[in-house]
Amino acid sequence: MKKLLQLSIIILPVSFFLIFFILLTEENQFPGADYREFDLPVFELKILNNDVSIANSDLEGDYVINVWASWCITCRIEHPYLASLAKNGIPIIGINYKDEKIDALEWLSKYGNPYQVTVQDYKGTLALDMGVTGAPETFLVNKGKIVAHYEGEINDYVWNQVFDPIIQERGMFK
């Protein structure tokens, strides 16, 4: 009995240390990824280039929402990748986040416009309702529900690891 007690005094702390160490060193490959499903918030905002209002109820099917701004350096880095997605038939809705209209229009004119439509979220209200903490952030929308969310630059690797498995599983963009 005494030997068992001595053995448990040694094994128990070592076990806790190993478990704690494993949990601390476990690497989350995509810390910016969030797979909680939630409804796209209700909104009505003006379209960036013509001041016509658009509401969430006007958006149908499967699409990507990209939150961007002209002042965002990472948005500039990911922009060519978004253009390639659009060229390959992925519909992208832009949310211009806390930006000046003239700056946003100039930016799109200079770098190209991969968005089917861009709404102007001057105050960041819609972005806040969606859980946005900054730009860029990208959302995958399936049947009016946000099914994936990524904070940070979208590139081929992130797209293939974070979004593509969900797209394949749900049969999106067909």
Model-based region annotation:
Residues K110-P114, D121-I167:
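Thiol/disulfide oxidoreductase modules built on the thioredoxin-like
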Residues E44-S53, T118-D121:
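Short gly/ser/thr-rich secondary-structure transition/capping motifs
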Residues M1-K46:
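N-terminal targeting signals for export/organelle localization
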Residues I54-R76, L82:
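Short active-site neighborhood of thiol/selenol oxidoreductases, capturing the structured segment around
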